[in-house]
Amino acid sequence: MTTWYPLIVNPGSTQIQELPSGQDLNLTGSNISNVASITITSSSTALINGSGNTVGNIGSSTGYFNTLFATASKALYADIAENYLADSADYIPGTVLCFDGNAEVTQCNTDSCATVAGVVSSAPAYLMNSGLSGEHIVPVALLGRVPCRVQGTVKKGSMMVSAGNGCARAESSPTIGTVIGKAVESFDGNVGTIEIVVGRL
Protein backbone atom coordinates (compact mmCIF):
# COMPACT_ATOMS: atom_id res chain seq x y z
CA MET A 1 0.00 0.00 0.00
CA THR A 2 1.35 3.43 -0.93
CA THR A 3 1.70 5.93 1.91
CA TRP A 4 1.23 9.55 0.83
CA TYR A 5 3.03 12.43 2.50
CA PRO A 6 2.31 16.14 2.05
CA LEU A 7 4.62 18.05 -0.27
CA ILE A 8 6.33 20.76 1.78
CA VAL A 9 8.13 23.57 -0.01
CA ASN A 10 10.38 25.93 1.92
CA PRO A 11 9.02 29.47 1.63
CA GLY A 12 10.98 31.72 -0.72
CA SER A 13 13.03 28.88 -2.23
CA THR A 14 12.74 25.99 -4.67
CA GLN A 15 13.73 23.32 -2.16
CA ILE A 16 11.48 20.44 -1.18
CA GLN A 17 11.65 19.09 2.33
CA GLU A 18 13.26 15.67 2.61
CA LEU A 19 10.80 12.81 2.99
CA PRO A 20 11.18 10.07 5.61
CA SER A 21 13.82 7.49 4.74
CA GLY A 22 12.68 4.92 2.20
CA GLN A 23 9.66 6.88 1.04
CA ASP A 24 8.99 7.95 -2.55
CA LEU A 25 8.03 11.39 -3.77
CA ASN A 26 4.92 11.09 -5.95
CA LEU A 27 4.03 14.05 -8.15
CA THR A 28 0.56 13.86 -9.67
CA GLY A 29 -1.69 16.27 -11.48
CA SER A 30 -2.40 17.58 -14.94
CA ASN A 31 0.02 20.49 -14.71
CA ILE A 32 3.16 20.43 -12.56
CA SER A 33 5.27 23.40 -13.55
CA ASN A 34 7.87 25.93 -12.44
CA VAL A 35 10.23 23.26 -11.16
CA ALA A 36 13.78 24.61 -11.29
CA SER A 37 15.55 21.26 -11.02
CA ILE A 38 15.30 17.82 -9.47
CA THR A 39 18.53 16.37 -8.10
CA ILE A 40 18.81 12.59 -7.75
CA THR A 41 21.35 11.31 -5.22
CA SER A 42 20.04 7.78 -4.70
CA SER A 43 21.48 4.77 -6.51
CA SER A 44 18.02 3.31 -7.09
CA THR A 45 15.71 3.89 -10.05
CA ALA A 46 14.96 7.60 -10.07
CA LEU A 47 12.02 8.10 -12.41
CA ILE A 48 9.34 5.42 -12.66
CA ASN A 49 6.29 5.30 -14.92
CA GLY A 50 3.60 4.29 -12.46
CA SER A 51 0.73 4.20 -14.95
CA GLY A 52 1.83 1.30 -17.15
CA ASN A 53 3.85 0.84 -20.32
CA THR A 54 3.52 3.28 -23.27
CA VAL A 55 1.85 5.86 -21.03
CA GLY A 56 3.25 9.37 -20.74
CA ASN A 57 5.98 11.30 -22.51
CA ILE A 58 9.02 13.30 -21.50
CA GLY A 59 8.53 16.65 -23.19
CA SER A 60 6.05 17.27 -25.99
CA SER A 61 5.85 18.20 -29.67
CA THR A 62 5.70 21.87 -28.67
CA GLY A 63 7.77 21.82 -25.48
CA TYR A 64 11.24 20.41 -26.11
CA PHE A 65 14.03 19.62 -23.72
CA ASN A 66 17.48 20.74 -24.83
CA THR A 67 20.16 18.06 -24.41
CA LEU A 68 19.91 14.65 -22.75
CA PHE A 69 23.08 13.53 -20.95
CA ALA A 70 23.18 9.84 -20.10
CA THR A 71 25.51 6.87 -19.87
CA ALA A 72 23.23 4.60 -21.89
CA SER A 73 19.69 4.27 -23.17
CA LYS A 74 17.45 1.38 -24.23
CA ALA A 75 14.44 1.03 -26.51
CA LEU A 76 11.97 -1.74 -27.32
CA TYR A 77 11.88 -0.94 -31.04
CA ALA A 78 14.73 -1.85 -33.34
CA ASP A 79 15.55 0.86 -35.90
CA ILE A 80 16.73 4.44 -36.22
CA ALA A 81 14.69 6.43 -38.75
CA GLU A 82 14.50 9.91 -40.26
CA ASN A 83 11.41 11.75 -41.49
CA TYR A 84 11.21 12.66 -45.19
CA LEU A 85 8.62 14.43 -47.30
CA ALA A 86 6.78 11.97 -49.54
CA ASP A 87 4.97 12.88 -52.75
CA SER A 88 1.27 12.07 -52.91
CA ALA A 89 0.77 9.09 -50.65
CA ASP A 90 1.11 7.95 -47.06
CA TYR A 91 3.15 4.84 -47.73
CA ILE A 92 2.60 1.79 -45.54
CA PRO A 93 5.44 0.42 -43.39
CA GLY A 94 7.80 -1.83 -45.32
CA THR A 95 7.47 0.07 -48.61
CA VAL A 96 10.73 0.66 -50.48
CA LEU A 97 11.24 4.34 -51.36
CA CYS A 98 13.69 6.22 -53.57
CA PHE A 99 14.83 9.82 -53.92
CA ASP A 100 12.55 10.95 -56.74
CA GLY A 101 9.12 12.41 -57.47
CA ASN A 102 7.69 15.81 -56.59
CA ALA A 103 8.87 15.72 -52.96
CA GLU A 104 11.93 14.14 -51.35
CA VAL A 105 10.94 10.48 -51.68
CA THR A 106 8.47 8.35 -53.59
CA GLN A 107 7.72 4.66 -54.03
CA CYS A 108 10.58 2.94 -55.81
CA ASN A 109 9.27 1.60 -59.13
CA THR A 110 12.64 0.83 -60.71
CA ASP A 111 14.34 -2.55 -60.40
CA SER A 112 17.72 -2.41 -58.66
CA CYS A 113 17.40 1.35 -58.27
CA ALA A 114 20.57 3.34 -57.50
CA THR A 115 18.59 6.21 -55.94
CA VAL A 116 16.93 3.98 -53.35
CA ALA A 117 16.34 5.79 -50.04
CA GLY A 118 15.31 2.91 -47.82
CA VAL A 119 12.28 1.32 -46.20
CA VAL A 120 9.34 2.97 -44.44
CA SER A 121 9.71 2.25 -40.73
CA SER A 122 6.81 0.84 -38.72
CA ALA A 123 7.89 1.92 -35.22
CA PRO A 124 11.34 3.51 -34.96
CA ALA A 125 13.22 3.38 -31.67
CA TYR A 126 14.64 6.81 -32.47
CA LEU A 127 13.12 9.24 -34.96
CA MET A 128 15.17 12.12 -36.37
CA ASN A 129 13.84 15.23 -38.09
CA SER A 130 10.63 14.93 -36.06
CA GLY A 131 9.87 18.62 -36.53
CA LEU A 132 9.44 18.24 -40.29
CA SER A 133 6.13 19.64 -41.52
CA GLY A 134 4.23 18.74 -44.66
CA GLU A 135 1.19 16.90 -45.96
CA HIS A 136 2.84 13.50 -46.37
CA ILE A 137 5.69 12.58 -44.04
CA VAL A 138 7.22 9.11 -43.80
CA PRO A 139 9.91 7.74 -41.45
CA VAL A 140 12.65 5.99 -43.44
CA ALA A 141 14.77 3.44 -41.56
CA LEU A 142 18.49 4.24 -41.62
CA LEU A 143 19.91 1.67 -39.21
CA GLY A 144 18.70 -1.50 -37.52
CA ARG A 145 15.94 -4.06 -38.13
CA VAL A 146 12.81 -3.12 -40.01
CA PRO A 147 9.93 -5.00 -41.71
CA CYS A 148 10.25 -4.85 -45.50
CA ARG A 149 7.89 -5.87 -48.29
CA VAL A 150 9.60 -8.45 -50.49
CA GLN A 151 8.85 -10.63 -53.48
CA GLY A 152 10.34 -13.85 -54.76
CA THR A 153 12.70 -16.23 -53.02
CA VAL A 154 14.86 -14.73 -50.30
CA LYS A 155 17.47 -16.55 -48.24
CA LYS A 156 18.55 -15.34 -44.84
CA GLY A 157 21.57 -13.07 -45.31
CA SER A 158 20.68 -12.16 -48.91
CA MET A 159 21.48 -8.63 -50.04
CA MET A 160 18.25 -6.82 -50.88
CA VAL A 161 17.63 -4.36 -53.72
CA SER A 162 14.49 -2.71 -55.03
CA ALA A 163 12.15 -4.94 -57.04
CA GLY A 164 10.47 -2.08 -58.92
CA ASN A 165 7.06 -2.12 -57.22
CA GLY A 166 7.68 -0.76 -53.74
CA CYS A 167 9.08 -4.14 -52.70
CA ALA A 168 12.59 -5.52 -52.33
CA ARG A 169 14.12 -8.66 -53.79
CA ALA A 170 17.27 -10.70 -53.25
CA GLU A 171 20.30 -9.95 -55.44
CA SER A 172 23.49 -12.01 -55.42
CA SER A 173 25.61 -9.46 -57.34
CA PRO A 174 24.24 -5.99 -56.62
CA THR A 175 25.75 -2.88 -58.17
CA ILE A 176 27.11 -0.05 -56.03
CA GLY A 177 24.44 2.09 -54.41
CA THR A 178 21.53 -0.32 -54.89
CA VAL A 179 21.64 -2.39 -51.69
CA ILE A 180 18.90 -1.62 -49.16
CA GLY A 181 19.98 -4.11 -46.50
CA LYS A 182 20.35 -7.80 -45.70
CA ALA A 183 17.57 -10.30 -45.02
CA VAL A 184 17.23 -11.42 -41.41
CA GLU A 185 14.90 -14.26 -42.40
CA SER A 186 14.08 -16.34 -45.45
CA PHE A 187 10.99 -16.04 -47.65
CA ASP A 188 9.60 -18.23 -50.41
CA GLY A 189 6.50 -16.83 -52.00
CA ASN A 190 5.04 -14.14 -54.23
CA VAL A 191 4.81 -11.00 -52.08
CA GLY A 192 5.18 -10.79 -48.31
CA THR A 193 6.93 -9.03 -45.45
CA ILE A 194 10.13 -10.05 -43.68
CA GLU A 195 12.61 -8.35 -41.42
CA ILE A 196 15.77 -6.95 -42.96
CA VAL A 197 18.66 -5.10 -41.37
CA VAL A 198 19.72 -1.78 -42.89
CA GLY A 199 22.93 0.20 -42.41
CA ARG A 200 25.23 -2.82 -41.89
CA LEU A 201 26.15 -4.04 -45.35
Residue positions per predicted region:
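Extracellular receptor-binding modules and their adjoining Ser/Thr/Gly/Asp/Asn-rich linkers
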Residues: 13, 66-201
